[in-house]
Every structure is written in structure tokens, then in C-alpha cells.
Amino acid sequence: KSSKAKLLFKSPLNTIYGTPFYWLSNSKGLVTKTIISGRGDPPKLSSMPKGPVVQENLGKKAAVRTYQDLLTNSYDEALFKYYMNAQVVYVNLKGKTKKIGQPGIIRRNEPSPDGNYILLETIHQPFSYLVPLYRFPILVEVLDIEGNPVHTLRDIPLAESIPIGRDAVISGPRSFGWRADLGATIYYVEALDGGDPNVVTEHRDQVYTLDSPFNVNPEPLVKLNLRYSGIQWGNRDIALVSARKWSIRRTTTWLVNPSNKSAEKIIDRSYEDRYADPGRPMTDQNQYGRPVLLLAGDRHTVFMSGNGASPEGDLPFVDEFNLKTKNTVRIWRAEAPYYETAISIFDPIKKIVLTRRESKDEIPNYYLRSLIDGSVS
């Protein structure tokens, strides 16, 4: 009741692309992305062209997709750099600021869970008139919280010649991120088929991890026979890795033990079959404030929340899925006349769930529901 908002610092955030700020896990400061001071007015289109639009053909055959709203000339490039350029700034709760690294087209500036490092992704030239910005060159590096370079993970080159296909990806390491369950461990994915889904091979992708201080060899975590599509970290013994293949509408989920590198496929289905959708694992925040798998008291059962498609319409549900036995128990499902979804589980032991409920006659509201006795408050 006595709290009030205050202005922390006056530098405007650059919110045009990506996440503009991240809280550190100790809640003592933020890593922000700000507009560069003194950047001036936007560039103006000259009435005199500087010259023709030039594109190089280096003699390589490459299939090219058709995209909308690409860069088309040097003026587009100037506008792109003007609006996208940013400065990473650390700010504490007293408003004291410190610049981190150099200004650039910052794609990502995510601190590690323990707050000691920053995963920095910077888009750089040469730009392309053939592909969107996520195919532009990207320098991926780790800085310490003071802004000092620690390790360069990869300088991803311009990707104009990726094979045609929904499951085609760039070759080499990609999809870098922090392990949510550890203080400072990077994970990334690398294609085993050169990124070409038409190549016949047993495995498509491999996931690796790299521990701080990042000067050791990466450790392989799991090989996937389909294209990597995501990972949810639990703890040192549990992670769920997802893969999919667009051409056959297939998705798989693997139970992986990050400690001993064992892996077991636990879900294999068509992602277009909504009736058989097992839902998504529910998460909880760990000591770093990062989402990790929410486990029941036995430490090997996860809670799954889904839309619950049925002939009567969507009836959202919560299931318990035992990762050892693979047995599923439905512990709650919405009932007409309400549409009610599980937002989070407050207490996995007492099974107290926060839900959002609405109907034709009631506006959406939030409730605490006991899944043991059915009481709602």
C-alpha cells in the first residue's frame, strides 16, 4: 500500500526488436537495451540516388524463398541501422548505469541465471535483400557482467542459401540459450545433416551444453532423429527435449538425463491430432527466477496442462504424467458451462491450482481451486 513507482533512469529503451530489459536473478539490477544517446533524426531519402542497387552472384546454386518487406536499397539499410542500433546498459536499483559492450544491432542481451554473464547476439553486415533479418550474420558471444568479452560462441554467417523446406536450418551451431536449472551453462543445437531435410540420415540434430567459463569442449546431450524444436529444463537429472518433422506433421518428446546423457522417447504423435494432444508440461520458478519443470513430490511426475479438444469443444485439463511408468492420470478437467484454464500450480503437494474461468454470463476471473476436494475460492 505504501509502495510507489519511481523513474529508474531516463535513457529510453529500444523496444523495436527483442526483449528490451532483463532482471538479474538477485533483483538488484537490470540489463537493458537503450536507444543510443544523440542518435539524431532519422536519415532522409535523398532525391539523388547514390548508385544502382548491386547484388553479387558468387556462382553458387541456391534455391531462394519469396519473402515480403525485405530491405531493398541503401536507404532501407540506413533506416534499419538507425532504428535497430542500441546500447546494452546495466542499471541498479539506485539508477546508476554502466554501458556493456559496444553499440550495435542487438538481437539478444540475456543475463545468465546466476547473473554473472550475458549472452549477447549482435546482427552485423553484410545485410541481405533476399532474406529477413533473422538470416543476417549474427555474432554470438558471452560477456561478463562488466561487459568484458569472455568467449565467442560463433559468428553465424549470412544465410541466403539454406535448402528449401520447412525443416531446413543453417549448418553449424544455432539456437543458443542458457540452461534454466544451472547458474551459467550454455546449450545449443547443431544439425547433423548439414541443415538439409532431404539428406537421408539417422539423426537430424544434436544438442550440446557448455559450462562456464566456456573454454572447455562442449558436451553432447542428445541426438534427435527429427528437427529440434525446444527444450524444457527440470534439474540435473530431468529435461524434456522436443523435435518435429513438418512434412509428416510428427512431433516427439525425449526424456533426457543431463547428468548421465541417457535419453528415452516418451511421446511420439501427430501434432495435428488435437484430441490426442497430451498438453504442455507446467513450470515453476527456481532460485534464479527461471521457469523449470514443476515436479510432484515423487520428483519424477510432471503436470501436463492442455486445451482438451473434444467433440463438445475445448475442455482444458491437468494431468499427472509419471516419467518412469509413462502412466497418465487426469486430476482435473473443466466442466460446462465454464471455460476454465489452469494458469499455474501453487502447491503441487496439496494440488492447489490458479485457474482463469469465464462463461457466457461471467467475465474472466481468477480462482484458487483445490484438485483434491474441488473447492474454489
Question: Which residue ranges define each predicted feature?
Answer:
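Beta-propeller folds
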Residues: K1-S375
